[in-house]
Amino acid sequence: MIGPAFLKQGVRHTDLGPIGDYPEGEYMVTTFVSSNEGDVARRTAFIRNNGFLGSQPSFTILSNHCAHLGCPVQPNGAVQYKQVSTFPGVTRLPVNPSGFGCPCHGGQYDTEGNRIAGPPVRALDRYSFSIVNGHLMVGKPFSVAYVIGLGAGAKIHVAKYSFPGEPVSGLESWLYPIQPPH
């Protein structure tokens, strides 16, 4: 009877509040609970409102898990420890990062999540998102090989979601051992 424990384990979209709560061009360290399991399912993401791309709102939503070993990445630069929490279950801290860094092994990322130094093998993972009734909904994470450009006009080279340490492009991605499904 192990089977039922593994049913319905898909990622649900989580409501992060009205898009107006995210100032254009500014990153917010956003902490949210991604399911009904409570605090054990708490996630943190770096969210920037990029304004509009055509007629659609554009957001950059970076995971805070380092692409090296999964340690928590921190913003490099000043953090305003003024908590902004206007939506239930969602906590936001405004930041103005010059990039992001991993304190564990020194991995460094630029403001688009590209790896710029240290041992990580790829860019920071991102979350998919949608806008429903004017609210930002965060969805499944996905891996990124690299990003060219900035903000709404950035070209994201998407890869299937991979564990930390797994290359997602180049020869290394073909040589890496096959991983179990996630």
For the regions a language model picked out, list residue spans one by one.
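N-terminal pre-ligand scaffold of iron-sulfur
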Residues: 1-91, 131-182
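Short Fe-S-cluster ligation motifs
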Residues: 92-152
